[in-house]
Structure formats: structure tokens, C-alpha cells
Amino acid sequence: MHQNDTVGLPHKIKWITLCGLLMAINTIFSSFSVPVPGGHIYLNDIIIVIAALSLDPLGAFLVGGVGAFLGDFFFYPLPMFVSLATHGIRSVVMSLIVGRYGRDNSPVVLGATVLGALIAIAGYTLGKAYVYSTWEYAMLKLPFEILQAFIGSATVSYTHLTL
């Protein structure tokens, strides 16, 4: 191992540790839900938004996409690929926006969380229509998808903007 290979090693170790911790929390939060007609509202959106606003795009994808995928894999496997794609895209887009325009810029953070919520709503609505082979079921769940996306985005945006 050359000396240049160890430059930035503490940063890499912190990054891997933080991503692993947030991915585990995301997976655990996937097991907690609030029952609603036709399904559940999951609390892991809060961790996904935190990761997207705090990490680089790769870390955001690992925490948001892969963490949600693992949560579904362990607790409710049918939509796990929908979660991987939807939360993965959502996390990367949000991370790219705040990474480019500033994590401390309130309008940017708010805009990124709103766009992320719209991606989650559209992704899950289309994904559920495909997975369950019925557009009606996806429409039945739409108000709850909106509520879940709003809870995650609003909670994190509020705390992020007031700190």
C-alpha cells in the first residue's frame, strides 16, 4: 500500500460507516408502519430524505434505494424492485440538486424535497399499477402515497431548515 492510497482513508471509513448505519436504520424503519385503508404508511421516508440531503449521490442511492429494497425484501417482498428504483432515483436526484446548489440554501432544500416527493408518488403509483396489475389499486393508494411522501419530506425539511 502506497502512502497516496491512504490519503482520505479516514473520510472513506466515515462515509462507509455512515452509509451502512443509515441503510440499517432505513431497513429497520421499513418494519414500522401506520395502517391505512388498503395498506400501510411507512416511516422510512424520513431516513431516505435525510440521506439524500446529507450524502453524495452514491451514498444517497445506497441508503435510499438499497436500504428500502432490503426493508421490502425482509418485510414485504412484492414491491421491492419498485422501492429500489423509486427511492434510488429520488435519492440521487435530491442529492445532485443539493450538492450542486447548496445544502444550506433553504429554497433549494425545499425544492429538492418537493421534487423527491413527486418522484416517490409517481414511482410508487406506476409501480403498484404494474406489480398488482390493476390501475384501480394504484389509484386507491395514491392519497396515502402523497401523505407518506409529505410526512417524510415535511419532517426533514422542517428540521433541516430550522437548524
Language model features with spans:
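Loop-helix junctions at membrane interfaces
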Residues: 1-161
